[in-house]
Amino acid sequence: MARKNSLHPFVQSLLTAAAASYIRLLNRTLRWDVRGEEHHEKLITSGKAFIYAFWHSRLLMMPRLQKHHNLPISVLISEHGDGELLARTMDHFNIIARRGSAQNPRKKQKQKGGASALKALVKDAKNGIVIGLTPDGPRGPRQRAQAGVAQLARLAGVPVLPTTYNVKVGKRLKSWDRLILPLPLPFSKAVFIYGEPIYVKDDIEKGRQDIEASLNHITEKADLMVGQDYSPPAPLMAQGDIS
């Protein structure tokens, strides 16, 4: 069962409004260097849905994606208590929040809502809504893609666009995902990178591997471009069915 957030609704409103203001401030004050925009632009101009895939550590600037087009975005957010705060923050950017898990629906899970969330996202994509997912969410292993993202791409028949960012001035938290917390220093360097779109055919495992490899490649590139140390993925021995 999902853990409920114990914060008073008024406190939640204050926190999420502050978080949304912080994200907008970052968008306005940082000096963004965007790479791979041609991949993004090609998918946008097609007018069809696709999937933004970004590691959990880089989800903070996800609302920045919507400012570049008028397409609606639907994101998958954990049913855990902290997911409620994130979902309410996304409301400030008119981003649709689907609650659940992107884990492989063919595996047993303790989390409820995963299968229904997957069905909702497939329906969204087929209706032309762009999807946003963290392949290693909600609880890792860090930078190891779960099969659910590739499964969604195949079922919906849409490509996956690997996406990442980093900033020159910020803090990397000691959380499981090593979350990047940018500081809004005016004109500080920030980099946003889009990888090449990935089309998942019948081989879900190959699709999963391709998504993971591409995300780690562009994430390392983004880290190095802003002079930060690359935070590698969790060891393979730590990978498994997280529940």
Regions found by a protein language model. Give the residues of each.
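Membrane-anchoring hydrophobic helices of lipid-metabolizing enzymes
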Residues: 1-66, 72, 88, 95-96, ...
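A cross-family acyltransferase "interaction/gating" segment
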Residues: 5, 143-204
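A conditional alpha-helix N-cap/helix-loop micro-motif detector
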Residues: 33, 55, 111-115, 142
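Structural motif
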Residues: 51-53, 76, 132-134
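Conserved nucleotide-cofactor-binding alpha/beta core module
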Residues: 78-127
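Catalytic-site beta-strand/loop segments enriched in glycine and acidic/polar residues
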Residues: 118-152, 156
